[in-house]
Every structure is written in C-alpha cells, then in structure tokens.
Amino acid sequence: MHDPHGHAHTVRPPGRGRNWPGPWRKTPGRLLGTSFVRLYQLTLSGFVGNSCRHLPTCSEYAHEAIARHGLWAGGWMGFFRVLRCGPFGTHGIDLVPEVLADRYVWFMPWRYWRIGRKRAETRA
C-alpha cells in the first residue's frame, strides 16, 4: 500500500493491537506479566502521555520481552528499559533481542541492564 507521496506502508492485520503479534508460549508467568503491562497500557498510560524516548515504547518493549523470554528475564529487561528512558538515558530504536546470549543467566538479573544500553552506545 502506498500513500500519496509514494512511500510504501505495511498494513497490520485487522484485530491486532499495539503489542507484539508474534507467537509465544502462554505460560502462567507470561500471561501474568503481559496482563499487567496491558492493564497499565489501558489505564495509567493515558495519564502519563507520550513521554517515551524509545521505539517501541517502554510498555510495548516490556510486553514483547515478557512474551519472548518469560516473566523473570522479560520483566527485568522491561524494568531496566524504563530506567534508561529518563532525560539523561538512551533514546531511539531499541528492539527486544530474539534470543538471549548465554551470559544473561537468571541468577544475575543486573546483566539485563546492558542489553539495550550497548546497542544505543554503538549508534551514537
């Protein structure tokens, strides 16, 4: 599909929301985490306004991270992403990694801080 200026646009399938539409295992932890993020999106997000400096937004990032990597890893990734989204933090496109490297183990959650930060530093 093209707009009047000739730019191509992808069309989202009908019925899809703003969150990641890919397939993911519906485990209890993932359902709980993504439901919490969705509840935030439907209630508090409207009061906060468009204040996110990243693309996808922090709540979309957290939803996708929890859906892809589970409540523990995805929750930490979303938490650290929100911390990076301040006035002196990172900005720009910061996608959720499809696969986590072996160094991101469950018993060292502070390592998840590095995921979006390193990519943002290399682009600057």
UniProtKB/Swiss-Prot annotation:
Transmembrane segments: none
Pfam family, one: YidD
Role summary: Could be involved in insertion of integral membrane proteins into the membrane.
The family this protein is said to belong to: Belongs to the UPF0161 family.
Segments of this protein annotated with the region Disordered: 1-24
Superkingdom of origin: Bacteria
Membrane among keywords: yes
Keywords: Cell inner membrane, Cell membrane, Membrane
Location relative to the cell: Cell inner membrane
Chief place where the protein resides: membrane
UniProt GO cellular component terms: plasma membrane
Protein name in the entry: Putative membrane protein insertion efficiency factor
Membrane topology summary: Peripheral membrane protein
Compositionally skewed regions (Low complexity) per UniProt: 12-24
